[in-house]
């Protein structure tokens, strides 16, 4: 989790955690 919303690099679940 780099704190950046990257759906192309991270799965949807991971991006959701970062986005929220």
Curated annotation (Swiss-Prot):
Coiled coil: none
Subcellular localization: Plastid, Chloroplast thylakoid lumen
Keyword Chloroplast applies: yes
Region Disordered, annotated ranges: 1-20
Record has Ribosomal protein as a keyword: no
Residue stretches of biased makeup (Basic and acidic residues): 9-20
Domain of life according to the entry: Eukaryota
Keyword terms: Chloroplast, Plastid, Thylakoid
GO cellular component entries: chloroplast thylakoid lumen
Protein name per Swiss-Prot or TrEMBL: Thylakoid lumenal 14.7 kDa protein
Taxonomic placement: Eukaryota, Viridiplantae, Streptophyta, Embryophyta, Tracheophyta
